[in-house]
Amino acid sequence: YYTAYAAGDITTLSSIATPISANEQSYIGLFSQYVDEYQNIKCYTKTGLDANSYLVSVSMEIKFTGVDTTAPGLDFFYVRTNDDGTLYIDNLYSQYNLANQENALDTSVQSLIGQFESESDVVELQSEVQTRYDEALAADENLANMIQTTIPAAIKDWVSQVAAQAATEQTEATEAAEQPETEQPQETE
């Protein structure tokens, strides 16, 4: 998953995580431009709503392009089992969708995630990763610049582009809907 994410490989990501909206695909393409790789990936799991689903916290370090120090990070995934027994990431609960709410969520799963994230071991993990993250930013000016300036500026530009594209598509759809249908004269014999 993380190898594909760093490469912006939507085809591979889509085989692991579903659904991935068009906007999220675009965001992954943008973010992957700044990431060389993910390192030191560790998964922490608990059972989800049923025996075939899992709550997964993933700690990792992100190696950004042109930056020596890695940035500690923490991700969350809700993993389910397909009918054929293979696991997949239910991407409705991705950080992207949770932040942007492009797709509706199951309130039972959402509630379980909230409980999971407030459990003492998960809170401790979050605190540990946050401390390492703060220390890494304080120790490397290039890392701090990448995370606090470069990437936010790129995301701001991306959001503007997505909004402009959505507005253009809406205008075109409205204009198409407003076009009166003209009757074609029928030939008579």
What is each PLM-predicted segment?
Residues 72-173, 183, 189:
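Short beta-strand edge/turn micro-motifs at domain boundaries
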Residues 2-5, 47, 90-92, 140:
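Alpha-helix initiation/capping motif
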